Amino acid sequence: IWDKERYLNWMYENLMAIKSVMSDNASIYVHLDWHIVHYVKILMDEIFGEDNFVNDITWKRQTSSGFKGKNAMGKNHDNILLYCKGEDFIHNTQYLPYSDDYIEQRFSHKEIINGKECRFKDAFLGTATTDATIEQLKRDNKIYYTSSGGMRLKVYLNETEGIPLDDVWTDINAVNSQADERVDYATQKPEALLERIIKASSDEG
């Protein structure tokens, strides 16, 4: 087991080497636990610059670790520090699917289009919407009329991408001992976690 000073020296050298080969639009994600994350954050501020700090992502692993008792709470998350090389870094917003309850509450309107039930919500049109735009929306069946005769915009469920991902990730579990993807590596990351990171910070091809 490494002591803290040796680990931080090793981490510093590796981060410097990684930065030297990063492209201008690249990002780096560093997965850490509660023991060391705050120390590594200071290193990364020095190496990449405080202005290039993007997010401290909280990844809830679903299984608690460490002492749990009257003097401590179970530790149920790790941290993923995200830094970019510069202001031109790639960022593709990722989305989470709506829950059934969310759909029921927010997309509460229904209508039949081409024999199929479609859900939608109504949204504010905006004061800058021109008459020409409103007429086009009417032709496209995108105007919802309220009981008082007001006009709102129809936003169909099948035209939305979901809920934009924030910096608290609770939907990806750690790799358990029975998982098909398990390779017996102590700090193995779930494929779903790696896929999310790749999609968020790189373009296809």
Language-model segment annotations:
Residues 1-205:
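Core catalytic lobe of class I
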